């Protein structure tokens, strides 16, 4: 049985009630905590190269969430289970446990895990998100390396407000 073992491996307190998942280029994650940390070599390798992927988990509070950069997606129980299965397949497991990346420049509530999925210019973080939505039976693009196309699927038209 594969498990993320989050309840034993993450520093949790009573204020961190939400968990954000993301997938992306491992080297970019580990070298670019802030946009000001960005280096030309890292960007070029991320855009034009191929490299290992990583999962990024962030424990947060509701006030840490920016509603302007989020959309609500309602899912059924079976859609939720399919989404969780997709996310779980994005972790590399060793001896049944997700392989955590121990050293990174982020904070106490950030966690990184190795992923078996390779990052490249045709499979980006936005492609991963789009595929997660597809797996959950939600609106998604045929393919997208950019977030704008995904968000446009969930845009509220002025006539619907």
Task: State what each model feature region is.
Residues 89-161:
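Activation targets extended, charge/polar-rich intrinsically disordered C-terminal tails
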Residues 70, 74-96:
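Internal catalytic-core helix/loop-beta-alpha segment
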Residues 66-76, 111-120:
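Second-shell loop/turn segments in exported
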Residues 1-74:
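Glycine-rich catalytic cores of cysteine/serine-nucleophile enzymes that process amide/ester linkages
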């Amino acid at each position: 049985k594969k498990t993320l073992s989050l309840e034993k491996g993450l520093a949790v307190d009573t204020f961190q009630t939400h968990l954000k998942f993301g997938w992306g280029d491992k080297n970019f994650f580990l070298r670019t905590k802030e946009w000001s940390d960005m280096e030309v070599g890292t960007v070029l390798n991320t855009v034009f190269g191929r490299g290992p992927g990583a999962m990024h988990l962030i424990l947060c509070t509701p006030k840490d969430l920016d509603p302007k950069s989020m959309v609500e997606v309602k899912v059924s129980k079976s859609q939720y289970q399919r989404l969780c299965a997709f996310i779980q397949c994005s972790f590399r497991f060793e001896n049944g446990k997700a392989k955590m990346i121990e050293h990174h420049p982020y904070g106490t509530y950030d966690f990184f895990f190795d992923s078996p999925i390779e990052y490249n210019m045709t499979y980006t973080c936005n492609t991963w998100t789009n595929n997660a939505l597809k797996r959950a039976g939600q609106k998604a693009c045929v393919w997208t390396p950019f977030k704008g196309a995904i968000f446009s699927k969930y845009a509220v038209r002025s006539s619907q407000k």
